[in-house]
Amino acid sequence: MSNSNKLIAEKNGSRYGRMIHPWLRKKQDMLADTPSRREGMTYEEELSKRQQGGVFIFDIAMQLTHGKGEHGLSGVAATLFNRFFNVHSLKRCDFRDVAAACVFLAGKNEDAPKKLKYVVTQLWQFKYPHNKQFQSEQHFLDQCNVVTLIEDVLLKTISFDINVDLPHQYVLKLMRDVEKGRNVYKDMVKTAYYMATDVLIITDWSVRYSCASIATACVNIAAFFHNINMDDIVPFELSDRWYRLEDQSMTREEVEAMTKEFLDIFSRNPQFHIGSLKKIDPLGKVKIVGMPPQVSSTVTPSGSSSNLKKIDLESYKGRPKPLSNSSDSPSTRPSFLPDVKNQKVVEQELMEQRMKEAAQQKIHRNGHRPSSSSHPLHHHSTSSSASNNSNHQNRSSSGLSAHQHQKPYNEDSRSAKRSMMYEETNSSKKPRIDYKMSFVASSSTTIATMHNDHFSQTTHQQNISTYARGVNEMMLNQVAPPPLMSVSAQPSTYQKMCMEYQRNPADSRHTMSSTQQISPPDEPSPPVSQILLPPPPPPPILPPRLDEMEEGELV
């Protein structure tokens, strides 16, 4: 057996040793004197803040562990959280930042460290649910600095006493001694194990009771929810001392007091529990008196059972209205469905519909009829204006015929429209300057008139302001700017050389040598007479070698 296993066996299965400092306090002391109490906060307000911090810790742990190992991480972090606020007041700092620092330190303590950026990201998302993204990188760095600073303060506050023991292992050991291998209370064991995490989060028992005492209370609470009496399921020899198996100082009265306190918190604060109330209390033995949990569904069932029955069409049309405060007697609700069984009613409705259609057609026909007396300024003297007027009449007549026959426009009518609209495609296009717009002021309306020459519109000069007339005259009398003076560029050296070569064509009769070199255009070139160089000398004649000479040949 290794040394670590020997140490665990000597500590009766406990992973950690005893706490260095006496963190456990009695409830009377916490009611009388705590840092938050000195700041004017009551015990109920302090307990509510501790519960909010515990739920905040569990939410962050669930996101970081993805549902694997959240009980150990959240239990250690909640214990560190309660120890911290036994020394500091809840009014001095934000409990959410302290909760994130406790999670960060608990990950290191449980040999499962979490990265700081993940902890800070989850802290920001739960702290600001409506703005889950950091505004800038500086906000992220500032929040990281806050968490690390609180972690240092937390370590100094608890004097590096990070030996946090959890009640979960004591729950399993106690149920193993009670069942004696029967394995018939699996659901009760699961509930007790879940309660070991729940009580650390929604109560301050981690700084009031030992882990063995908390485990005993969790087993008794689970037995209460499952309607089981512990004295009936324990062996006969353990019937009077089963609650002292893990903690010799526990009494039956203390176990009952802890159970009653948890049930009171359970009934007054159901929103702080980390699980479903139906799973915790399947039999509904505890009456909820506090704020009920939020229901996701917004549909409320109707109180009348008649609405859930299937009825025929006649009953649906003539069903009575529900009773209201204004009227004492029920009245028949008017139906929006036509009575198809009565032939007279159907014929009457058809006649009314036809009369409405005829009235609409008459109004439409009167609205599109051209009147020459009402608008004398709309007459045009050119063929283009006449063609436009005829096109408008054709469109209105075609629209009337289509409305009378209740038929949509076909492709022939559309093609006819296109031909009339684009019949002057070969005409010359007017320049854009000729299209000048102006308005003629009538008695109450402004009528736009388009002339046949350049489609201009006339207006009264008195309607134009003085500033507008001045701007118009300035634009008309504006003198065109003088043309830019042409600057003669001096010829480059290369251009001068080419010009000189063109003036002296006799130099081109000389044959150019292979070694002739012409300077680049940017550099000053020598005269053309110096460009032609003499040919290179002939190669030297070497005497033949001795080994290549034949016999009898003279050197």
Curated annotation (Swiss-Prot):
Task: List GO terms (cellular component aspect).
Answer: cyclin/CDK positive transcription elongation factor complex; nucleus
In alphabetical order, the GO MF annotations are: cyclin-dependent protein serine/threonine kinase activator activity
- Segments passing through the bilayer: none
Q: Name one GO biological process term.
A: embryo development ending in birth or egg hatching
Q: Low complexity bias located where?
A: 321-335, 382-398
The role this protein plays is:
Regulatory subunit of the cyclin-dependent kinase pair (CDK9/cyclin T) complex, also called positive transcription elongation factor B (P-TEFb), which is proposed to facilitate the transition from abortive to production elongation by phosphorylating the CTD (carboxy-terminal domain) of the large subunit of RNA polymerase II (RNAP II).
Output the superkingdom of the source species. Eukaryota
Instruction: Give residue spans, biased composition: Basic and acidic residues.
Output: 341-359
The protein's name: Cyclin-T1.2
> Could you tell me where the Pro residues compositional bias lies?
521-543
Keywords of the record, alphabetical order, are: Cyclin, Transcription, Transcription regulation
